[in-house]
């Protein structure tokens, strides 16, 4: 048997349990589990397989039929209950426990959850949420599944690659989050894709130990990390979250050979004091992620001794449209994410969906090559056929990401189309502005957004969290603008600067850009923003 013949994530684990029964499948370092375990959590493939079988039997006896919401953090319980339900042909709705109470009912109602399975410490909270919102949904803890009685025991069906495996919600810039229906095949293709890349991210069967701090409630950790390891007999090293102070300790003690990251991680790690133990070239083979600040990329690799391999993907495209710079040249420091592989058809288009001239930026559209252009992609948005049709307008997945092709065929990320600031006919990337101010001595975090301007159409507003309060906001704002002008053309500099003690972010610490824009507009309206428009002059270009 081979993972390549698996028909579901559960079957993938079963196959690896036969090939590598005594290899470690899951490891949670002590730094990530100290509040519930006196020692690191460790499960071999044999132990994980047995635990899944035991929990599958418990769920069978409940008579469950429908989606189950999982509130299990980045714990072994998440994987065990997800895969047990997967064995029964049932889907899960991962819920981030850090989500505010008022947001949770939407996910339970829209996703039509028939039960909530949670860690014991969240049981009372989620019971109260369901009760106060008049949701007739039973809530059980992971260790009391047998108390649930929803009908006659159910049969275990044969695995179906096309069956729904999970419902993951993606937050859009407007409106409610959309539920992405992800099939078993979606997850299987993630493992196949990772195994096929080679180059810097080549996976060695039974030998890799992949560390990730990302939440299992998101696509990267739930589908990419898990399937990469489970399909190769590797070990998933799952942190509860990113802990800068103990990050390298976790890396060393867990004997990680690879790691996954978000763009903010390298910046934070580079800010830590240098030490004699910074060189990980003898241990870590690669980092896999997206969004590293171009100014940090080469510095990070030189200091820590391993490549940060940039990739592009989105929940909707899965592995079907994923692209990664796993082979040279990687064009370090340019936001390059590689050359599309042969299984992918792609094009760059303008706002009218017409192909742009070679070398010009345009929206990336992707689809699978062959008879099924949606192979490896999401199955659609739950209860939203209009949005699904819009996503696949013209027979392509319209990603909304603005990308540029280099002469050698590699692609570089410019920005999300909705993050492009259009000022007097110039297209300005919010990410480019943010990168330009990231090393300003006073800035902890900065997010750029477009605000309306009667003369220019859009102007650049920059919302900033300072490392310490300033006694002279105007001078500090001017210093920030001057810092940008040293690096970018004058029209890209912030016209408005808004200081705030906090900015809205997602669970993975990405800015909630729609909320940031609302904050900026309100600050300007209420005269709480610093107006620097008069200082934007055509005196210098870079």
Where are the model-predicted features located?
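AMP-binding/adenylate-forming catalytic core of the ANL superfamily
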Residues: 99, 370, 379, 387-390, ...
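Conserved adenylate-forming
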Residues: 59-62, 154-162, 167-212, 232-234
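Conserved ATP/PPi-binding loop(s) of AMP-dependent carboxylate-activating enzymes
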Residues: 354-390
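Structural core segment of the AMP-binding/adenylate-forming
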Residues: 11-13, 61-62, 83, 87-148, ...
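Conserved C-terminal "lid"/linker of ANL adenylate-forming enzymes
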Residues: 421, 447-453, 461-465, 481-542
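Conserved AMP-binding/adenylation subdomain of ANL enzymes
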Residues: 188-209, 217-258, 272
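Gly/Ser/Thr-rich phosphate-binding loop
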Residues: 256-261, 270-331, 345, 354
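Conserved AMP-binding/adenylate-forming core of the ANL superfamily
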Residues: 2-5, 22-62, 69-75, 79-83, ...
